[in-house]
Amino acid sequence: MDRRRWVPSTPVVTLLLLFMLFAPAPRLPSRNGESSEKSIKAEKRAFSEIKNATFLNIPERVEHSLTFPTEIWETRDGLFEEPVGKGDSHLNHTSVMTGNWNILPYPSFGKVSPNVTWHTTLRNIVMSQSGRFSANLYEYVDGNSDGISFVLNLENNNDTSVYHMTFHGDRVKPINVFLGSTDVTPNFGGVDVIPWLLKDSPYKDAPPLDGTEYFPLLQNRSLERIETRLQDAQTVGWSPLVFEEEEVTCSAFVFLHNKNTGLDKETLKAIENEFYHPQGVSTQKMPEVFVSGLVYSPDCNVAFTFSNTKGPRNFVLENHLVRFSSLYIFIVLSQIFVLLRQMRINSPSHVQRLSFLTIAMQAGLDAYIAIFFLSTNAVIEKGYLPFVSVAFLSLVPSVMFTMRYLALILRVQNSNMPPPAPRPVTNNSSNNNTNQSNASNENSPNAPSAANDNTETTTVNPPQEDDQPMTQHERDQRDWSAVCLRFYFIILVVCIASLYSAFWPVIYRFYFISALIFTSYSFWIPQIIQNVKQGTSRSFTWTYILGASVLRLYLPLAIFIDSELILGFPPKYFFALGLVLWMLFQVLVLLVQDTLGPRFFLPKKFFLSSPVYDYHPVIQQDDLEAFMRDANVCPICMQPIELVSTGSTLNPASMMVRRNYMLTPCHHLYHRQCLLQWMETRSICPVCRCHLPAV
C-alpha cells in the first residue's frame, strides 16, 4: 500500500473544524490609553471611598446595593440566630456539598431591574420553586477573616437545567459567618459591599450581631481586593467598575452560617495533621461541614434558601478517592493476568472463533479509563501516584497486549477469508492482447499481408503499480491502519463528549454516562453473534470470561452508587443492579451456547445454507455394534466413555450425557474435554488425521 496517498478521513477533519469553531473563547476587553486611564481612576476612587467610609457613613455606590426587602433582612437575622452547637468550628471549611434549595417569596419577587437581563436558565430554575444544588466551598486561611469562594450549581426540580454562580468574600471566624458576592459591575457594588452586609436590620430593634465590631476587619479585606484590581487595571487596562459584560445577568449576595463540629480545636488539628503528615496515629473521623445559607439578587429580585446542607471536607473526599484508586490498581493487575492467560491460546483454529469487536471494545474501554484517571489526577494533588499508576496499568493491556491480540485476530481471520475478486479487464490490457495476436500473425508465413494493413496501431502501456494485486501482507497492513484510525477516532470523540458533559444538567449527564457504560459493557454481544454466524461455541476461556466480567464491574458500580459528590447525581441502585444483570445475561448466553449449541435460540430454517456439524448425536449402547471393538474408549485418555442408556433420549439426564462425549465426522468417539483440548492446537482427528469442523 502506498502510504503517501493517504489523506485524513473526512470525519476527522470535520470534527477538528467543529471543535475549533465552537470552542468557547474568553471575551478580551479592548485596551487603549483612554480606557486604561479611566479604569485606574475608577479603582482609585473606589479605594478612597471604602477607606474613608465608616460603618454608619456608607458610600452611595454601596448603599444602592444594600436596598433589601424586609423578608431578606428577617431571613438573614434568622440565619445568624441559629444555634451553632457544641465544640469548635472547622479550621478550614473547604468542602464539597449537595442539598436542596427553596425560593423565598416576597411581594417584589421577580421584578428585574431595567438594565439587567434575566438569564433564561436561571429564570426557569427559580420558577420551579425548588430543586437540588451542588456547591464547592473554598476557604483561604488568613488571620481572623479568611477569604472564601463559593461555587454554586443550581438545578431545577427535574434536573434538566443548571446555572452556575460564583461568589467571593470573607469568613468571619468568631461568629461562624460567611459573606460573599458575585463580581463587581458598574451598577453593583459586589465584594466592596461586604463590610456592610452585617449592618443592622432597619426593621428590627435588637440585631443578632454587632456589625461595628467586625467592620475594620472586613474593610481591610475589601481594600486589599481593590488594590489587586488596581494592579490589574494598570497592567491590563480594564476594570469591572468601568466596563461590564455584553449581557449583564443577575448579581447576587450570599450569606452562610456554619455549625460547630462537636470537637475541640486540638482534636481537629490532630485529624488534619494525620492526613497531611501520616504517622499511623488513630484519630476520630473528621465531622462533615454543615452550612445553612441565603442567596439574594437585588438586580433580579430573587432569593432562595437552603438549610443544614452537609458535605465532607476536601481532604476526606480526596482520601476516599485515593483508597478507591489504590484498590483499582489490583483490579487492573488481575485483568492483565487473565488477559495474558487468554493470549497463551493463540492457535489459528482458536483465534478464528474470537470476536474482533469484543477485544476492540475492551481495549477502547481501557484507553478511556486511562484518560479519565489522568484527567482526575490534574484536580486531586494527593492522588498523583495511585491515579497515574491506574492510568499506566490501564494503558498496558490497551496498547501492549490487547492491540497485539487484535492484530493477531485480524491477520488470522483475513487469511481465512476468500481472496478478493479479480480486477475487471481494462482497455489497456485488451489492447495488449490484440497487439500480441497481431505480432504472432506477422511471424506466421501463412498470414495474409492485408492483415498488417487493416490492423490499427495501438500503444502498449507498461503495467502500472496500482494494477498489481495486493498481497495478503499488504491487505493486513491496510486493514490494520484503518482499524487503528477508527479506534483512536472513536476514543477522541468519546473523550470530547465526556468533557462537554461535565457542563450539562445532571439528568443529561447521567443519561450520557449510563448509555456510555451500558454500551461499553456489552462487549460479549459481538462474541455471541460471532458464535451464531460461525456455528461455534468454544471462544474465550471461561477464566477470561468470568474474570473480565467480574473485575470490570468494579468501576461502573462505583460510579452508579458512590459518585454523588463528583458527578452530581444521587446513588442509582436500580441502574447498578441492571448493569449486573445485563452482564450476567451475556455470560449465561455464552454458557448456554457452550452447552446446547451456538444457535440454540434460533430456528434451523435460518441456517439451511450453513449447517453446523453436531458433535453430540444420540449414541446408545446398542449402537456400538456399528463401530469397531472398544469404540466406547477414548483414544486420547484411554478411559471408557459414558453413553446414553437405552430408553428416552429427551430427558435432561440423557441430554447432559450427550454433552460429555463428541463424535467426529470420521466416526471416532472421544471425551468432550479431551477432544476440545486437542482442538485448541490442531483441527485434525487424532486417529485418522481427517479435518475436523470448528466446535
UniProtKB/Swiss-Prot annotation:
Cited InterPro entries: DUF2921, HRD1_E3_ubiq-ligases, Znf_RING, Znf_RING/FYVE/PHD, Znf_RING_H2
Q: Which reaction does it catalyse?
A: S-ubiquitinyl-[E2 ubiquitin-conjugating enzyme]-L-cysteine + [acceptor protein]-L-lysine = [E2 ubiquitin-conjugating enzyme]-L-cysteine + N(6)-ubiquitinyl-[acceptor protein]-L-lysine
**Annotated stretches, region: Disordered:** 419-473
Matching entries from PROSITE patterns are given as:
ZF_RING_2
Q: What class of enzyme is it?
A: transferase
Q: Which UniProt keywords apply?
A: Endoplasmic reticulum, Golgi apparatus, Membrane, Metal-binding, Signal, Transferase, Transmembrane, Transmembrane helix, Ubl conjugation pathway, Zinc, Zinc-finger
- Superkingdom per UniProt: Eukaryota
Q: Give the residue range of the signal peptide.
A: 1-25
Q: Does the keyword Lipid biosynthesis apply?
A: no
Where are its TM segments located? 320-340, 354-374, 383-403, 487-507, 510-530, 541-561, 573-593
GO annotation terms (biological process): proteasome-mediated ubiquitin-dependent protein catabolic process; protein ubiquitination; SREBP signaling pathway; ubiquitin-dependent protein catabolic process via the multivesicular body sorting pathway
Query: Could you say which residue ranges form the zinc fingers (RING-type)?
Result: 634-689
Question: Does the keyword section mention Repeat?
Answer: no
**Entry GO MF terms:** ubiquitin protein ligase activity; zinc ion binding
Which residues are on the Lumenal side of the membrane?
Answer: 26-319, 375-382, 508-509, 562-572
Kindly give the membrane topology term recorded for this protein.
Answer: Multi-pass membrane protein
Its Enzyme Commission number?
Answer: 2.3.2.27
Cytoplasmic topological domain ranges are 341-353, 404-486, 531-540, 594-695
Spell out the Pfam families in the cross-references: DUF2921 (PF11145), zf-rbx1 (PF12678)
The listed locations are: Endoplasmic reticulum membrane; Golgi apparatus membrane
Pathway assigned in UniProt:
Protein modification; protein ubiquitination
Ranges of compositional bias, category Low complexity: 427-454
The record, for PANTHER family, names:
RING ZINC FINGER PROTEIN, TRANSMEMBRANE E3 UBIQUITIN-PROTEIN LIGASE 1
Quaternary context: Component of the DSC E3 ubiquitin ligase complex composed of dsc1, dsc2, dsc3 and dsc4.
User: What function does this protein fulfil?
Assistant: Catalytic component of the DSC E3 ubiquitin ligase complex which is required for the sre1 transcriptional activator proteolytic cleavage to release the soluble transcription factor from the membrane in low oxygen or sterol conditions. The complex also plays an important role in the multivesicular body (MVB) pathway and functions in a post-endoplasmic reticulum pathway for protein degradation.
Question: Would you tell me the protein name for this molecule?
Answer: DSC E3 ubiquitin ligase complex subunit 1
- In which organism is this protein found? Schizosaccharomyces pombe (strain 972 / ATCC 24843) (Fission yeast)
Taxonomic lineage of this organism?
A: Eukaryota, Fungi, Dikarya, Ascomycota, Taphrinomycotina
